[in-house]
Amino acid sequence: MDALEQARAEIDEVDAQLAALFERRMAAVLQVAEYKRAHGLPIFDAAREAAVLEKAAARIHAPALRPYYKDHVQNMMDVAKQYEALILGQNRAAYQGVEGAFAHIALRALFPHAEAVSCPTWDEVFAAVERGDAAHGVVPFENSHAGDVSAVLDLCYNHPDLWVVDVYDLPISQNLLVLPGTQLAEIRSVYSHQQAIAQSETFLKQFHLPATAMANTAMAAKFVADSGDKTKAAIASAETAALYGLEVLVPRINTDGDNTTRFIVISREKPTAGNRFSLLFTVDNKPGKLAEVIQVIGASGFNMASIKSRPMPHVPFEYYFYVELVGDPTADETAALLRELDRTCRTVRLLGVYTK
């Protein structure tokens, strides 16, 4: 046996030992899940995870190996959380649309082992999470080309019991999908989500193609596939084309080559750890009140990564505001900022905590 074979044999032997230890560890995870269910405890415990990682690093004598072992332990904890979610019936994530929609693609990246729950509207995604039918919801929040998804921000405002717990940036490549054998000259109408249509506006104008908005890109692709009509085309992902038996006639028709959609993850569980946090607030309709809030944030030392305004529901010509701040949401400075904003604003609410 040469040196390579001997080393591989050693790895195989260790892997066999790890398999037995993995089963033993997951049996303990099962006990943890049952305890959490009995006592109403959340799956994620940030303080516990941090302590486990520090203890794990201390066990490794070779400094060069410590970061790799911490990654290994973090992966084991992530697997454990997925298993706990399955045991506790929380292994469901909701999205708007059908299989192949960009939200579905984002969901699969975020929750590869979750049961994906399809909803007809964004409102239904929020409702499913609020009812407990899904532990998480994945919805688009903004696009680097087409801008904000205002309706989703309004839903965040209207659902004060839900939190934003994660964000995910999905690079978007819009493609013109057709029935097999279709030529560009045959197309008379194009179907897609309004955002995808806006992202592909230059291409559509160039070829004088009228577009009709649908609930999402995957539904548009399914509609074209089911129609059997070569005069119809859809704008969607290449993954969606494969899913519904369509061909990519023209790839990457979106105007912005760096097109990215940011998705947010909503949950009933309040997040605790991250390097960014977002707030929703309102101010009295008086001169200088918004400027005063911005000055308070600036004086606190937090960088304001984003600020948006939206009309308040049922209150004509008044607005609520969204801000995203860079910083530790658990720091004393954050608590001080929230106290000062509570004094300055008419209303203020912590919306989300996440890592970006």
What are these regions (language model features)?
Residues M1-K356:
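Domain-level signature for soluble enzymes in the chorismate/prephenate branch of the shikimate pathway
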